[in-house]
UniProtKB/Swiss-Prot annotation:
InterPro entries: MFS_dom (IPR020846), MFS_STP/MST-like_plant (IPR044778), MFS_sugar_transport-like (IPR005828), MFS_trans_sf (IPR036259), STP/PLT_plant (IPR045262), Sugar/inositol_transpt (IPR003663), Sugar_transporter_CS (IPR005829). One of its GO terms (cellular component) is plasma membrane. It is found in: Membrane. Belongs to the major facilitator superfamily. Sugar transporter (TC 2.A.1.1) family. Keywords: Membrane, Sugar transport, Symport, Transmembrane, Transmembrane helix, Transport. GO terms for molecular function: monosaccharide transmembrane transporter activity; symporter activity. Pfam families: Sugar_tr (PF00083). It is a multi-pass membrane protein. This is Sugar transport protein 14. The lineage of its organism: Eukaryota, Viridiplantae, Streptophyta, Embryophyta, Tracheophyta. The chain crosses the membrane at residues 26-46, 84-104, 121-141, 144-164, 171-191, 205-225, 286-308, 315-337, 352-372, 382-402, 428-448, 454-474. Residues 1-25, 475-504 are cytoplasmic. Mediates an active uptake of hexoses, probably by sugar/hydrogen symport.
Length: 504
């Protein structure tokens, strides 16, 4: 046995013996577990709205506020070009990046539930500090605590959902994380729209309300069951079997339980999971799951739209309230897309959705870039009719992303890793994701200022590259039991060279 996967055809044949029924216990566990996405989503949605509020800018960034009020023609794309302002957004993701390594240890030793609880406490503290902030240092400190919370939550929640779900509906269940993320973004935008009208402390309310999902997640986490996979990994076999019976709704769980035990036995033989992740036999998981997909998910440019939608729409000539309304519409489209993806992932497959959406997103980014090149900048005012067309195009882009790269960027990596490298692999996934999230957050506004419309064409080129990556390197994982995904590499034109003969 290698890679913690089943090493013979008997393992693959055993998958058809798995049984499950949807129980209230299973539904409760998935709903509470997926709430980790609401933390991530609320922050994604609230940051851009707050940084576009005049009261927030006057208190912490008076220079940007004055420049914004002057309506200088040369600052059409550059109104918000300030590295400290972008650090307010990106500091959270740099903190999350660093925290993922501690989160990997907690997730492996104390379970997925332990990381969920730690993440909710840290996120709560960050929300309190940000709401009470008196200076930029307090803002950044609060963001660091929020980042630690997101690092732990993003480490544990996708694993939790993948391990709790039966193979046949794993795609749908795992995408609860994306759905709650999208709902968090939408709620944050609706709150920003209301709090912008509360002077001069509305921004404090927006930031402080981050404590609400943190409290709900903590309270739910106290009664949340640990995953059978994690319990087996900790040597609690009887408890693991009891939980598996409850979440599957049947006593006939011996085949699945045996697979979990065998995978755990292989995992225990691995003393250093991070070093094992670099082993030749794990090269497909490393390249695709740990690095490629999480990096490309951010390089679509989607999070730039989520971070800075209100700021971007204001830069394109929309008023303050109009920009918040436009970004709210955009994020409502993201929620619709997340619901669509819950149905389509297990019906059409992960690979098809990624490829189809890449074509769509490429086209939308090109059209937006060319439109802005011809009609905006250098003192030109953007016609309202054209502005509405841009909002529609961005909504279509969001719909494509929200049913593909958004959920698949978390779902597919969580499916690929064998048990002995799963917590380490997910740690690298979150680390890479947050690194590129922070990089994009820190660089987007300055890139918008210097590249102007070219930033959208740059994202179009990146999307073309990531579509090619999926086409050539990613096999379909739809309805494959999570402990048997490893067997797919043996049938792939490239990856079979890395995994063949490792079990002999």
């Amino acid at each position: 046995m290698a890679g913690g996967a089943l090493t013979d055809e008997g393992g693959l044949k055993r998958a058809h013996l798995y049984e499950h029924r949807i129980t209230s216990y299973f539904i409760f566990a998935c709903i509470v577990g997926s709430m980790g996405g609401s933390l991530f989503g609320y922050d994604l949605g609230v940051s851009g709205g707050v940084t576009s509020m005049d009261d927030f800018l006057k208190e912490f960034f008076p220079g940007i506020y004055k420049r914004k009020q002057m309506h200088l023609n040369e600052t059409d794309y550059c109104k918000y070009d300030n590295q400290i302002l972008t650090l307010f957004t990106s500091s959270l993701y740099f903190a999350g990046l660093i925290s993922t390594f501690g989160a990997s240890y907690v997730t492996r030793i104390y379970g997925r539930r332990g990381s969920i609880l730690v993440g909710s406490v840290s996120f709560f503290l960050g929300g309190v500090i940000n709401a009470a902030a008196k200076n930029i240092l307090m803002l950044i400190l609060g963001r660091i605590f929020l980042g630690i919370g997101i690092g732990f939550g993003n480490q544990a929640v996708p694993l939790y959902l993948s391990e709790m779900a039966p193979a046949k509906i794993r795609g749908t269940v795992n995408q609860l994380f994306q759905l709650t993320t999208c709902i968090g973004i939408l709620v944050a935008n609706l709150i920003n729209y209301k709090t912008e009208q509360i002077h001069p402390w509305g921004w404090r309310l927006s930031l402080g309300l981050a404590t609400v999902p943190a409290i709900l997640m903590f309270l739910g986490g106290l009664v949340l069951p640990e995953t059978p996979n994690s319990l087996v990994e900790q040597g609690k076999l009887e408890k693991a079997k009891a939980v598996l019976i409850k979440v599957r709704g049947t006593n006939n769980i011996e085949a699945e339980f045996q697979d979990l035990v065998e995978a755990s036995d292989a995992a225990r033989a691995v003393k250093n999971p991070f070093r094992n992740l670099l082993a030749r036999r794990n090269r497909p998981q490393l390249v695709i799951g740990a690095i490629g997909l999480p990096a490309f998910q951010q390089l679509t440019g989607m999070n730039s739209i989520l971070f800075y939608a209100p700021v971007m729409f204001q830069s394109l000539g929309f008023g303050g309230s109009a920009s918040l309304i436009s970004s709210t519409i955009t994020n409502a489209a993201l929620v619709v897309a997340a619901i669509m993806s819950m149905y389509s992932a297990d019906k059409f497959g992960r690979r098809f959705l990624l490829l189809e959406a890449s074509v769509e997103m490429f086209c939308y980014m090109v059209v937006v870039g060319v439109t802005l090149a011809l009609k905006f900048g250098e003192g030109k005012e953007l016609p309202k009719s054209l502005g509405l067309i841009l909002v529609v195009l961005i909504c279509l882009f969001v719909l494509a992303y929200g049913r593909s790269w958004g959920p698949m960027g978390w779902l597919v990596p969580s499916e690929l890793f064998p048990l002995e490298t799963r917590s380490a692999g997910q740690s690298v996934v979150v680390c890479v994701n947050l690194f590129f999230t922070a990089l994009i957050a820190q660089c987007f506004l300055v890139s918008l200022c210097h590249l102007k419309y070219g930033i959208f064409l740059l994202f179009a080129g990146l999307i073309l590259g990531m579509g090619s990556f999926v086409y050539f390197l990613l096999p379909e994982t739809k309805q494959v039991p999570i402990e048997e995904v490893y067997l797919l590499w043996r049938q792939h034109w490239l990856w079979k060279k890395y995994v063949e003969d490792v079990d002999e």
